[in-house]
Amino acid sequence: MTIKNKVIIITGASSGIGEATAILLAEKGAKLVLAARRVEKLEKIVQTIKASSGEAIFAKTDVTKREDNKKLVELAIERYGKVDAIFLNAGIMPNSPLSALKEDEWEQMIDINIKGVLNGIAAVLPSFIAQKSGHIIATSSVAGLKAYPGGAVYGATKWAVRDLMEVLRMESAQEGTNIRTATIYPAAINTELLETITDKETEQGMTNLYKQYGVTPDRIASIVAYAIDQPEDINVNEFTVGPTTQPW
């Protein structure tokens, strides 16, 4: 197993997919650096991990701020001497029709879903290039693969993540940096994403969908662990993951 003793940063780690991934990777022996804005939730997750003899620290992090991302990577290197992988998982999904003109929410999605990923990449890339190894994993969405009414801006941000990660993979191969990438496209996974939707009609429709088909975040955690656990000369770069019963 290649996860044991790997130093792994997780953003958006305070709930949902991030929390589930942290718990699973800790069980497999990873050394974790957890990041999110909600410190009280991070504290509880770290306590849970340590109670099971796992190893984890946390840092309050706003992924929209470049300096926060840089400090996060610096913390990991200061504490553990290196970073082996980063899981860029922070995101929001305030879906609504374009005609609702929720421009502030559009901007928030762009800042967190796109710039947050870019900031994470920029923060970790120098150390990965220097050590000629590293693994960058990002959460996109099936919304980045298939359009649907109400998901225009969210889908656009997740398509951007898809393109960023694919070009990063190509450039890493060309430059010989040995940096691996993986992009995950979840469908209906039961997380707090629905709580970010303020458009009532959209929220009701998405809630009904998730009630019918949604599965637990640990399903995605196992995919992240699988990607990290592959040999260094193998790059499994895309995972589309959803409930068996969901027609999408």
Swiss-Prot record:
- Catalytic residues, per the record, are Y154
The answer to whether keyword Oxidoreductase applies is yes
Pfam families membership:
adh_short
**InterPro entries attached to this UniProt entry:** NAD(P)-bd_dom_sf, Sc_DH/Rdtase_CS, SDR_fam
Task: Enumerate the Gene3D superfamilies for this protein.
Answer: NAD(P)-binding Rossmann-like Domain
Establish whether keyword Nucleus is in the entry: no
Q: What class of enzyme is it?
A: oxidoreductase
Q: Where does substrate bind?
A: S141
Query: Of which family is this protein a member?
Result: Belongs to the short-chain dehydrogenases/reductases (SDR) family.
Descriptive protein name:
Uncharacterized oxidoreductase Lin0452
Identify the species of origin. Answer: Listeria innocua serovar 6a (strain ATCC BAA-680 / CLIP 11262)
